[in-house]
Curated annotation (Swiss-Prot):
Disulfide bonds: none
Lumenal side: 37-179
One Gene Ontology cellular component annotation held by this UniProt entry: signal peptidase complex
Stated family: Belongs to the peptidase S26B family.
Name used for this protein in its record: Signal peptidase complex catalytic subunit SEC11A
Organism of origin: Mus musculus
A family per Pfam: Peptidase_S24
Residues of the signal peptide: none
GO biological process, one term: signal peptide processing
Domain notes: The C-terminal short (CTS) helix is essential for catalytic activity. It may be accommodated as a transmembrane helix in the thinned membrane environment of the complex, similarly to the signal peptide in the complex substrates.
Length: 179
């Protein structure tokens, strides 16, 4: 009966109240987008916050940990650093540790990664013929984390009905909530 109460509240609103609530919802969404874009500029990363999706980095990071990233051009990549990188042809970025660095005479740096919980390096994950990653492949470097808070994101991706139910309820709450 909880959802019916929400619908009754929406029906009882006059047009002005409903318009105000829709605008309020729009302000919340646009504020979230502005905060995200601001974080992108400050951190230099296209994705300043990511969720660890697998157990390949255990015990350092667990599935569902939320990572905060930076990607400043002037900072050199070092062995032992945890980086988030994209592989051509794959949509989801990977969180792994830098295992080796290969520096050419011209100063161009390439590096090899490996998950802490994996037996072998990541060459099998890279696109065919690629043996090293380059700076352009890096989304960011881990600078901090919050344990397990990202499990909500994993649940929403694994169970789409759960995601739509949560989004629907949040939207209804914003529309019905009166200040």
């Amino acid at each position: 009966m909880l959802s019916l109460d929400f619908l009754d509240d929406v029906r009882r609103m006059n047009k002005r109240q409903l318009y105000y609530q829709v605008l309020n919802f729009g302000m919340i969404v646009s504020s979230a987008l502005m905060i995200w874009k601001g974080l992108m500029v400050i951190t230099g990363s296209e994705s300043p916050i990511v969720v660890v999706l697998s157990g390949s980095m255990e015990p350092a990071f667990h599935r569902g940990d939320l990572l905060f990233l930076t990607n400043r051009v002037e900072d050199p990549i070092r062995v032992g650093e945890i980086v988030v990188f994209r592989i051509e042809g794959r949509e989801i970025p990977i969180v792994h540790r830098v295992l080796k660095i290969h520096e050419k005479q011209d100063g161009h740096i390439k590096f090899l990664t490996k998950g802490d919980n994996n037996a072998v390096d990541d060459r099998g994950l890279y696109k065919q013929g690629q043996h090293w990653l380059e700076k352009k492949d890096v989304v960011g470097r881990a600078r901090g984390f919050v344990p397990y808070i990202g499990i909500v994101t994993i649940l929403m991706n694994d169970y789409p009905k759960f995601k739509y139910a949560v989004l629907f309820l949040l939207g209804l709450f914003v529309l019905v909530h009166r200040e």
